Amino acid sequence: VGHVEVTKLRHQLPDGRVLFADVSFRVADGAKVALVGPNGAGKTTLVRMIAGDLVPKSGTVTTSGGLGVMRQFIGSVRDDSTVRDLLLGVAPPRVQQAAAALDAAELAMMEHDDDEPTQMRYAQALADWGDTGGYDAEVLWDTCTVAALGVPYERAQYRGLRTLSGGEQKRLALEALLRGPDEVLLLDEPDNYLDVPGKLWLENELRESVKTVLFISHDRELLSRAATRIVTIEDGRSWVHGGSFATYHEARNERNERLEELRRRWDEEHAKLKALVLRLKIKATYNDGMASQYHAAQTRLRRFEEAGPPEETPRDQKVRMRLQGGRTGVRAVTVDNLELTGLMRPFSVEIFFGERVGVLGSNGSGKSHFLRLLAGGEVAHTGRWKLGARVVPGHFAQTHEHPEMVGRSLVELLWAEHSLQRHDAMRALARYELQFCGDQPFETLSGGQQARFQILLLELAGSTALLLDEPTDNLDLASAEALEEGLAGYQGTVVAVTHDRWLARSLDRFLIFGADGSVYETPEPVWDEGRVVRER
């Protein structure tokens, strides 16, 4: 099949900080290995090194077999990318190159169709497309679009990605990779944005696949059901748990206890050696015969210190979110006979101050459009909706594409958005474990760090109604728990689109976007609604 082997990898950030050092592990043929760790620990950077996007400062990466990669932020909502572009993005390089040559030849034909050299180049591009497996890829893509979107590739290929939900884009890429020819897959947060049926599908596909898979995830259910081994990156180092996620936390606690004991013993021995050197130094001042013992003790102490202490026990994150909110009118959101054009049938609902309402349903059913409409975005609709008195919406978008933040550091953004001086900005960032990222451009942060920063902006904005679209998808476990605690103390209204079964337990009631195009309310979460059947 294929394998991945990483040996003593090291990566240093532009500011000189070491992101990780001495990272070593092996993903054997057919293994399903999860890569876990806090947001910003370097998981995505490590995957990019294995994929060949980055060159390590030191260490080696060895792989065998074809390598398929799904990056953390796949697809797009802000440009004219199409379904074909997304599928080409996860295709083997030879297919990508042949497609680029064919596109160029077709464009030349449109401009100079009577030119014989142009016609010859077009004929050669068609032949190369077939020789590199392009037609086989199109057969595969047809299967993928039918499975993910319910339509054949011929109808779907030029459809804009902005018309697909984040979950539909993810499912499409996963279908192509899991069905494709590559023997080794690198999947960065593959479960993000998938609805619950999609997550269950992914869990089963990973278990059944013969491919070698290294995947990053914070989803406790996926880790429990699909991973056979766990590689952890924390505090710049790696360690491997050879069992499943069911025994991971116990193994991590035992490891930390061992590290603490080793450090205690090292400190005791260090103190003894320093005391010995001091005693012998005093004796050697009035007894020349003790000089050799004194120098021997000095050498022993120096070698002990050069060998260094054992590995530090990893520090647990302490993310502290202070979501305030504020009193609003009793009816925070009123929806009257609202129809999201081309998505769902008309529905009416009232959401009252202080409620926590979950918005559930399959990928592509219109949930994100609904939140975007409430946030003031341009969404085609009929019917009426309004926000109550003193309702200030704060929108957490599902995708992290923020062109207005690109090239600007977190400190700059906090000054521009909320007039925070550097000292106050760094204090706010420290509560979100982002203090070391203050001078980094927003786009260089990990997905989880970007999510935390967006939540900080909501906190500082004083929003009285939070419109959260998949808020926990990129968050590590500590950050997700901090968000749940923050929402519990929030004095305002929360409307959350989520497929997180843990987060849903803290919500009061649910608005379900059904497979038949209807929208209905339930007191308990409903996870088994299928894809909405509509003309595409």
Language model segments and positions:
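ABC ATPase nucleotide-binding domains
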Residues: L259-L280, A284-T299, K318, R531-R536
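Short amphipathic coiled-coil heptad-repeat segments
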Residues: D142-L149, L276-R279, A297-A307
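Non-transmembrane amphipathic alpha-helical segments
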Residues: A98-M109, A125, W266, H270-L280, ...
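Short low-complexity stretches enriched in small and charged residues
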Residues: A21-A28, M290-Q293, R315
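Proline-centered turn/helix-capping motifs that create local helix->coil transitions or kinks
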Residues: A137, R303-R315
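ABC ATP-binding cassette signature C-motif
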Residues: V1-E261, M321, G325-R536
